[in-house]
Design a protein with these regions (language model features):
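Two-metal-ion RNase H-like nuclease active-site motif
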Residues: 44-54
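Metabolite-binding pocket within alpha/beta catalytic cores that recognizes anionic/polar moieties
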Residues: 29, 35-45, 58-72
Length: 334
């Protein structure tokens, strides 16, 4: 076992050395791709929205619980002046029972779409009812391919169309209200920048850690070269997807760069976003995420202990049918 672990470790170290050398070479070949950020003193109203999910499997249906929370941090002259929540600091979760026939490949999309239904819906309402300068989503601001159902029941397809419509409302409302719409992807596994630069197919964040200096951003690039070739972007509308841009920001030498997406007809807006995010993301050198996003994550999070009361009520209401509805794996006699 020790020999096997050593072999794996050596392979990883060798690969990492190669990745670092290639990353530095890419920087030398593309010096204009890395921009120094001039951080500004935080001032304004910055919002964040995140959602939490828990799912329970029964034989006859799937029960999904979702909570989404909006958080607004108001800064003045570099100091946090106030914190507000939408619709409240700890709203009750919403429950969704589904009894549609469901193939295994559509379990993930069903759960993700249900979360997005609440999360993006909350973001739209948050925009309409709160004065903001910028709104950040936890994650991408676009629907992902993994969220699109593969065939499946018509109810699932209707759910997908409802979510796509909410995304359209989100973009339209942000534009109407003059709010910058952006998303922070904490742990990006994509290779969009690698593809754009013709680099080896590494995950962007893995090689950018070596290529970027603290306080830098990458030059914003289009989210996709051909939005019409991606099913979910085509469903959303290529006119919207064509105005979504991507860059990475490195706020600390002890943490990886994180990905930022934003909606604008002018990619130069990315520099303004980075100027705000940089100082706010340097509170903790080992976890460079802006505090309003962290607060939204904490407020939206669902844990099974907090939902035990609701689940016990349901179990009691089902009575003798309870064991029938439980998945067989939960009834193992050993």
């Amino acid at each position: 076992v020790i020999e096997e672990v050593e072999r794996i470790a050596q392979r990883i170290l060798s690969r990492e050395t190669q990745r670092r050398e290639e990353a530095l070479a890419l920087r030398r070949q593309n010096p204009d791709f890395f921009l120094k950020i001039n951080p500004v003193v935080p001032s304004g109203r910055f919002g964040a929205v995140d959602g939490g999910l828990l799912a329970y499997e029964y034989m006859g249906f799937e029960l999904i619980a979702v909570r989404a929370v909006g958080v607004r941090y108001t800064y003045g002259a570099g100091h946090l002046a106030s914190v507000d929540y939408y619709p409240s600091p700890s709203p009750p979760p919403r429950f969704f029972p589904y009894d549609m026939p469901l193939e295994e490949e559509n379990v993930g999309p069903l759960r993700s779409l249900t979360r997005l239904l609440v999360e993006i819906g909350t973001a739209v309402d948050f925009l309409r009812n709160t004065d903001l300068d910028m709104l950040f989503l936890d994650g991408s601001i676009l629907p992902q391919l993994v969220d699109k159902p593969r065939g499946g029941d018509s109810e699932l397809k209707r759910l997908y169309r409802r979510v796509i419509d909410l995304y359209r409302q989100l973009f339209a409302t942000a534009k109407e209200r003059g709010v910058v719409l952006a998303g922070v992807v904490k742990d990006s596994k994509g290779s969009r920048l690698s593809t754009y630069l013709g680099a080896p197919p590494y995950r962007d964040a893995s090689w950018l850690h070596y290529a970027m200096e603290v306080g830098e951003m990458t030059r914003p690039i289009p989210y996709a070269d051909k939005p019409e070739d991606q099913a979910t972007l085509k469903d959303l509308g290529t006119d919207l997807a064509a105005h979504v841009w991507v860059f990475f920001l490195k706020a600390s030498d002890l943490d990886r760069p994180f990905r930022v997406e934003f909606y604008s007809e002018d990619p130069r807006l990315g520099e303004r976003i980075a100027e705000v995010l940089l100082p706010l993301s340097q509170v903790n050198r080992m976890y460079t995420i802006p505090p309003f996003l962290l607060e939204a994550d904490i407020r939206a999070r669902l844990v099974k202990q907090s939902l035990s009361y609701y689940k016990e009520l349901l179990d009691r209401r089902l009575g003798a049918m309870y064991n029938f509805f439980r998945m067989r794996g939960a009834n193992k006699p050993f």
